[in-house]
Amino acid sequence: MQRSFIQLASLLAFFSICQITLANENIKIITNNWTSQIVLSHITGKIFTTLGQPVEYVKISTSDQWGALARGTADVQIEVWEGTMSDQFTRLVSDRSITNAGTHTATTREEWWYPSYVEEICPGLPDWQALRACAEFFARPDSQGNGVYYAGPWEKPDEAKVRALNMNFEVRVLRSGDELWIELNKAYKNKTPIVLFNWTPNWVESRFNGRFVEFPLYQPACESDPIWGVNPEFLYDCGNPKDGWLKKATSTRFSDENSCAFKTLKNINFNNQQISEISALVDVDNHSHQAAATSWFEQNKPLWRSWLPPECQ
């Protein structure tokens, strides 16, 4: 009997030590390569530290983040965009490989975009057929007369869209959002026609006048049934979703190992205006990502404190 009691006590002590170890492990927060995601990640990290949770930031591509979340080598993604991430997110949540941690108030759109002055050269815009007819105006010296569309490094089927809609464009994939804004600033300064990947919420809408290209309205069948849409031979003969969702995701173990942090994450909620203003702190006001996060954190204490569950304060 005494031996059994000792064994039980030892086992309980072992599990207690394991729980303490898990609670003291760093929460691994994913950072990608666009401003709002990076700053919101650092804001989230600061909130977690008020709960006594140590954090670290894991820089990883959007394509690699899913495996990291599924394996538990990363814990938190604060921005899951419907337009670029819905397929992987939905599949992995359905497979119970990752966890849906809730939805922001913000609604999203990701699409081809142009500055308003381009309409003087191509007056049929924002209709996509006008863009197709005006392709030559978007050519560059090394594009052999093809229009150039500047894409980001995210998972968009732009080349498939160009093929399906028979557009005389080539897709140039840039490495980051910063490189997109370099091209935009250069073109805007000289009033050069440009069409590039843009999204909302984003700081661009507070700095530049412009519009999204209006492609055929998105339907899920556009991605799975060639017969659907304007071209019965190819998929992706449509635009991207409008008024898309912006979600949060975690590893499956996160809610058990970090209960208060998980409950807080579910409460964290940003709207379009907040995300645009946060992005502008970096891309317009030239703050670092960390400084922007600190500034927002200090100026919005009542808001983020309202996200903390009462039992965790």
Set out the residue ranges of the language-model regions.
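Ligand-binding pocket segment of bilobal, Venus flytrap-like solute-binding proteins
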Residues: A74-I78, Y149-S224
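Short helix-initiation/N-cap motifs at beta->coil->alpha
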Residues: W34-T35, Q53-A70, V173-E183
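C-terminal functional modules
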Residues: P241, F254-S255, F262-Q313
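Short, well-ordered beta-strand elements
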Residues: N24-S36, Q53-V58, N146-Y150, L265
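Pocket-flanking alpha-helical
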Residues: S41, I60-R96, E183, W203-R207
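A conserved helix-loop-strand patch within extracytoplasmic ligand-binding domains
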Residues: S97-Y150
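A bilobed periplasmic-binding-protein/Venus flytrap-type ligand-binding module shared by bacterial periplasmic
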Residues: E110-I121, G244-E257, A280-L281
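C-terminal lobe and pocket-closing loops
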Residues: V204-T264, I268
